[in-house]
């Protein structure tokens, strides 16, 4: 069993910021678990600028902003495991996670920080009846196709609804 003072589930901007703040407060044993292949979360697909003015004093794109935080995480010696899915958290702070390299991980934590961000859910996950027509996708999926994967999902776009819940 692995032992850490803090396990952060989620390696996006909030997860990295939480880990860095914990390190700044004197916590040495920190592990970030991220299900994507890299740290950075949603920032990786936000190719527009506007990030970093308050924290770094300059305007950065999402990936540039993420890279700065990843650099700080590395400089501070904060451990992380990418491509790792958190499966379960027990009442006594044991985190079960898995990845291709380590298999099943059992991690004892003194504290756990949940910083998993958000994911758009298809209407099936929201219990909305019906089937989705070919080519209908969420805004986040379209953004990922264009900004990360380099695909053009279509030449004509209709946005029916975009909601942000705060």
Q: What is the predicted function of each stretch?
A:
Residues 22:
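Aromatic pocket-lining residues of Rossmann-like dinucleotide-binding sites
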Residues 64-119:
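Feature captures the FAD/FMN-dependent oxidoreductase FAD-binding
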Residues 164-166:
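Conserved small/polar residues in nucleotide/adenosyl-binding loops
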Residues 3-5, 27, 83, 92, ...:
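Phosphate-coordination loops involved in phosphoryl transfer and adenosine-cofactor binding
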Residues 118-139:
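Glycine-rich beta-alpha-beta "Rossmann" dinucleotide-binding loop(s) and their flanking helix/strand
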Residues 25-42:
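Glycine-rich FAD pyrophosphate-binding loop
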Residues 44-81, 134-135, 142:
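N-terminal glycine-rich dinucleotide-binding loop that anchors FAD/FMN and/or NAD(P) in oxidoreductases
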Residues 2-14, 156-160:
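Beta1/beta-strand and adjacent pyrophosphate-binding region of the FAD-binding site
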């Amino acid at each position: 069993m692995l032992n850490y003072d803090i396990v952060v589930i989620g390696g996006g901007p909030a997860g990295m910021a939480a880990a860095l703040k914990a390190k700044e407060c004197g916590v040495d044993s920190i592990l970030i678990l991220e299900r994507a292949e890299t740290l950075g979360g949603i920032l990786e697909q936000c190719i527009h600028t506007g990030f970093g003015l308050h924290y770094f004093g300059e305007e950065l794109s999402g990936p540039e902003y993420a890279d700065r935080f990843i650099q700080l995480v590395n400089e501070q010696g904060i451990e992380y495991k990418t491509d790792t899915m958190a499966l379960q958290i027990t009442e006594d702070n044991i985190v079960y996670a898995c990845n291709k390299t380590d298999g099943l991980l059992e991690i004892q934590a003194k504290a756990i920080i949940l910083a998993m961000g958000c994911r758009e859910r298809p209407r099936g996950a929201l219990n909305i009846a019906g089937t989705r027509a070919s080519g209908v996708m969420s805004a986040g999926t379209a953004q990922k196709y264009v900004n990360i994967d380099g695909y053009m999902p279509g030449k004509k776009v209709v946005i029916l609804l975009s909601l942000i819940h705060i």
